[in-house]
A protein has these predicted regions:
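Acyl-donor (CoA/ACP) binding surface of acyl/acetyltransferases
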Residues: 1-26, 30-34, 70-188
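Generic, well-ordered alpha-helical segments
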Residues: 19, 30, 43-50, 61
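Short helix-loop boundary/capping segments at the starts of domains
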Residues: 33-36, 60
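Conserved GNAT-fold acetyl-CoA-binding loop/helix
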Residues: 36-56
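Sparse recognition of residues in long alpha-helices and their boundaries
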Residues: 43-44, 67, 168
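Short, charged/polar low-complexity linear motifs in solvent-exposed/disordered segments
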Residues: 44-46, 56-58, 101-103, 177-178
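A short helix-loop-beta-strand connector motif used in the catalytic cores of GNAT acetyltransferases and
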Residues: 56-68
Length: 188
C-alpha cells in the first residue's frame, strides 16, 4: 500500500519518501521559515541551486540516501502532505561494516509535534531492511542541541562517546556526542 502512494514506509501520521528535484520549492520555503530553529545546528539548502545540488547528491550518490518526512493529508507536495522534515543517511559503507551516519532536521511548522520521532523511526527501520540492510546507524550531535539529542534518545539510540572538534560548522570545529543504534537494538 505504501509504495502505491509513493511512500517507502509510513506510520499513523507521516510517510517517508525519497527526495526529488520537484520538491525544491516547498523545501526551500520550509528552510526559510525554519532559519531560527536550525541555527546554529544546521544549514540546509536555501536557494534553488543549492537545493538542486543537495538533492542531486542524495539521489545520485550510492553512499547517501535522503528521505523527506511528509505529513499524511491533503496539503501541498507529491503525496498531498506537507514536508515536515528530512533525514539523510550519509557515508553509507557496505561490506563488513554496514553502517551509515544520520543527519536530520524538522521544519518549524512540525517541530514539537512528534512527527520527526515517527519519521526517524521509519527511516531507521527502512535502513535496517532491504534494500540497504545496514547493521548500524550513527548520529553525531553537538552537545547543546537538546532537541536532536532528545530525538535520538526517543528513537532508541544510545550515547557511545564524545568527539572533540569533530565537524567544521559555522566557522569552527565543533564537539559532538556520538549516538548509535544497531539492528539488534531496534525497538520491535
Amino acid at each position: 500500500m505504501s509504495e502505491l502512494r509513493g511512500y517507502l514506509a509510513e506510520g499513523p501520521r507521516v510517510g517517508i519518501r525519497p527526495f526529488t528535484y520537484e520538491d525544491g520549492a516547498e523545501f526551500i520555503d520550509r528552510v526559510r521559515e525554519s532559519k531560527a530553529l536550525h541555527h546554529p545546528w544546521l544549514a540546509p539548502p536555501a536557494s534553488p541551486d543549492a537545493y538542486a545540488a543537495y538533492a542531486g547528491r542524495l539521489i545520485e550518490d550510492p553512499t547517501k540516501a535522503g528521505f523527506l518526512v511528509c505529513e499524511k493529508g491533503d496539503g501541498p507536495g507529491v503525496e498531498g502532505g506537507a514536508v515536515a522534515g528530512f533525514v539523510n543517511i550519509n557515508n553509507i559503507v557496505q561490506g563488513g561494516f554496514l553502517c551509515g551516519a544520520l543527519g536530520y532536521g524538522a521544519f518549524a511548522h512540525a517541530a514539537g509535534r512528534g512527527l520527526m520521532s515517527e519519521g526517524l523511526e521509519l527511516v531507521v527501520r527502512y535502513a535496517f531492511g532491504p534494500p540497504l540492510r545496514l547493521h548500524r546507524l550513527e548520529i553525531n550531535v553537538q552537545p547543546g542541541n537538546a532537541a536532536s539529542i532528545a530525538l535520538a534518545r526517543r528513537c532508541g539510540f544510545r550515547l557511545e562517546g564524545f568527539s572533540p572538534g569533530f565537524l567544521y560548522i559555522d566557522g569552527a570545529w565543533r564537539d559532538h556526542e556520538r549516538w548509535a543504534i544497531t539492528s539488534e537494538m531496534l525497538k520491535r
